[in-house]
Amino acid sequence: MAKLKSLQTDIRVNANREKIWEVLFNQFSEINIYHPGTNDSRLTKGKNGEIGCQRVCQFGSKMSITENVLEAIPLEKLAIDANGFPGVKDIMATFSLRQLGAESTEVAITFRYRTIPAILAMFMSRSMKKNLHQV
């Protein structure tokens, strides 16, 4: 099996960990509210706020992806996997939260992924990092 590529970026958010956790995990199916590239999202399995829940996200009229919650440590870490990205065989994302102040949190986002063909990973990394800072 080919090695997964890794991309990490840290984003400072002007909100406490509780507010961020509420949006990331307890409102998992509502990513379209804050992610500008998502037209729609809906829960297809389980319930918001539980491990194993699944959502489908629609990007434009032709692309959709399915995401599953793999792991959740309340107020600290959320891990998901995704399927349906063109040219991507495997992708997993981990969101780690660190409180910086009363209304300031660092969100460390780590993606691990494998593309087909492998050369696509180089171009994908640049695009992913840029898009993350627009959310």
Where are the regions that the model predicts?
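Beta-strand/loop substructures that line and gate deep hydrophobic ligand-binding cavities in soluble
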Residues: 82-134
